[in-house]
Amino acid sequence: MGSNILYIEDNPDNMMLVKRALESRGYTLLEARTGIEGVAAAEKNELDLILLDINLPDIDGYEVARRLRGSVKPTLAYTPIIAITANALKGDAEKALAAGCDVYMSKPINIRELWARVEAFVPAPNQ
């Protein structure tokens, strides 16, 4: 498989949808179900991109992004983070960007938009 992408998401349906969509393009998707688990996975693995849900059961995605950007692992300061969230209120995108996310997407997930956003940072291995 190809480039490593970490998806931090507690909803199994969203996880499966994104996993299938990205693996069909040749990406390898690593999974984390909580914010704490996601930070640990990011610090343990070599990643090309992080997809981040904002509403997580332990710490929210904003805090996850801040921890990733401040990690002792230097590459996490520059690893692209795409926030994918149901939060679509005014100011949510700005809050995600201020926390360290590079791009903000709202749910429901549009697969073509997801591919375009991901491929802007990491070319698809199968394309």
PLM regions and their residue ranges:
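Conserved acidic carboxylate
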Residues: E9
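The feature encodes the CheY-like receiver
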Residues: P57, L89, P108
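Active-site residues of response regulator receiver
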Residues: D53, T85
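C-terminal output helix
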Residues: I109-V118
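Short hydrophobic/Thr-rich beta-strand motif most characteristic of the beta2 strand and flanking loop
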Residues: G26-R33, A41, M105
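Charged docking surfaces used in two-component/phosphorelay signaling
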Residues: M16-S24
